């Protein structure tokens, strides 16, 4: 199944149905998963390989009610499921934990509940996936020039090998994503990966310049929505037809090769 077909199945479905579609996919793969219920939702995660230490791959399955939830974040779910498939087919023993968090859109409640219950002691880092279905370049955030870590170095090296652009951003409009609870708990090698275009980069520069000039909120929103990445963000138009199979496959390949390089 193409990755885009997975996104299509998820499009517009209620969050509970999206979670059920993920578990059905995992059942079809014959993969065991852990469901972690907490006060307001339920996380899912899958442990792969015999290694005690795990490389985390983060996704979230909830969507904002107004949005179909394709790029945000059906794209990441499709890649996460593909990483599980690749691990199975390779017969790999490298330790990986793939997360499908609930309630990212309402204050990172799912990832916060995971960290509060399980902690971070068996994780070497987290590759968190957010908006990975459009574009031909990777944005790593929030990652400044001084930040370092095995996963970060490996991902950037893989991107160079695959001749894919890869840029660090201190901030990508908002720094809120499921990497946050892990960093706050003391896991420094945790960051978010987003797929972008050169046009997104140019508009981001314009956006931050406007912030420095203290532009009005309406003007900032006008600038932001010119970026392909944010044109359909949290909108009913965030549907699978807007996404690219190539972007999904490129992300999956980069994440998988990073996992292999870090084992």
Where are these regions (language model features)?
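Extracytoplasmic/secreted proteins, especially bacterial periplasmic and envelope-associated proteins
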Residues: 2-5, 17, 21-28, 82, ...
């Amino acid at each position: 199944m193409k990755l885009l077909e997975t996104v299509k199945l998820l499009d517009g479905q209620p969050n509970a149905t999206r979670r059920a579609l993920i578990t059905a996919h995992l059942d079809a793969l014959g993969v065991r998963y852990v469901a972690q219920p907490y006060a307001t939702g339920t996380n899912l995660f899958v442990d792969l390989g015999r290694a005690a230490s795990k490389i985390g791959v983060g996704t979230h399955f909830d969507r904002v009610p107004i949005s179909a939830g394709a790029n945000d974040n059906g794209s990441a779910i499709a890649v996460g499921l593909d990483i599980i498939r690749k691990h199975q087919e390779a017969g790999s023993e490298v330790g990986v934990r793939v997360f499908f968090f609930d309630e990212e859109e309402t204050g990172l409640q799912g990832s916060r509940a995971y960290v509060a219950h399980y902690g971070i002691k068996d994780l070497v880092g987290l590759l968190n996936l957010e908006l990975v279905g459009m574009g031909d370049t990777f944005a790593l955030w929030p990652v400044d020039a001084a930040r370092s870590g095995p996963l970060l170095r490996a991902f950037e090296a893989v991107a160079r090998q695959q001749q894919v652009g890869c840029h660090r951003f201190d901030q990508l409009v908002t720094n809120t994503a499921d990497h946050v609870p892990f960093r706050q708990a003391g896991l420094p090698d945790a960051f978010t990966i987003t797929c972008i275009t050169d046009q997104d980069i140019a508009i981001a520069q314009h956006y931050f310049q406007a912030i420095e000039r203290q532009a009005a909120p309406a003007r900032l929103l006008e600038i932001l929505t010119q970026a392909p990445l944010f044109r359909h963000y949290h909108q009913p138009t965030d549907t699978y037809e807007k996404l690219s199979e190539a972007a999904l496959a490129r992300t999956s390949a980069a994440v998988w090769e990073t996992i292999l390089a870090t084992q």
